[in-house]
Curated annotation (Swiss-Prot):
Pathway: Carbohydrate degradation; glycolysis; pyruvate from D-glyceraldehyde 3-phosphate: step 3/5. Keywords: Gluconeogenesis, Glycolysis, Isomerase. Gene3D superfamilies: Phosphoglycerate mutase-like. This is 2,3-bisphosphoglycerate-dependent phosphoglycerate mutase. It comes from Prosthecochloris aestuarii (strain DSM 271 / SK 413). The lineage of its organism: Bacteria, Pseudomonadati, Chlorobiota, Chlorobiia, Chlorobiales. Transmembrane segments: none annotated. The active site is at H9, E87. HAMAP family: PGAM_GpmA. Its EC number is 5.4.2.11. GO terms for molecular function: phosphoglycerate mutase activity.
Amino acid sequence: MIKLVLLRHGESQWNRENRFTGWRDIDLSEKGLAEAANAGVLMKEEGLTFDIAYTSVLKRAIRTLWNALDTMDLLWVPVEKTWRLNERHYGSLQGLNKTETAQLHGEEQVLVWRRSYDTPPPPLEKTDERYPGNDPRYASLSSEEIPVAECLKDTVARFLPYWHETIAPQIKAGKKVLIVAHGNSLRALVKYLDNISEEDIVGINIPTGIPLVYELDDDLKPIRHYYLGDQEAAAKAAAAVANQAKG
């Protein structure tokens, strides 16, 4: 049986402050560092090991991966970083407090921006200092590849080619894979793996720092999936993600 492990980064400083983060490179909070280490403990207790790991080019995911692997004594595992695993780009909302944004625009509108499949938030101007085209880590990307705002549909479109061309072949070759990424890049993969509809993906929330194990058949079709550790705590953490924009 194939096991694929997905892990959303630990709590970031902006998660703690309830701000839209997107492609802004915000580090982990103290709680997030502890979550990352605890994720490593949970995976080690489960008897998991890895041959290769994938993560984004954002430090909150990279540091989560480091801390988890360090706890497992697996820092030697090869790591591939890709912008295709970045969080979805939240456009001009990046840096804004979610509750204050909901008070300004209404909870329903913010829910659409946060969780709908095909409605992006207001775009970022390319003259804005937050525009990723100004960041050297994206120097190899074309202007068409660099987003000014993304909906989940856009995130799926940029991630799935990497899944099919890079990650899936490694899994089929027998490699044990860990993916440490972000709420929406992982939702994009979960939507694909579980064949979740555009309507139902709105209700899927992934908590920080809790490993999600997928058991797959030889065609990489899911047999089942489950969070490691306390299931009730995982459910409460996922519900808390859903409530972030509420007052």
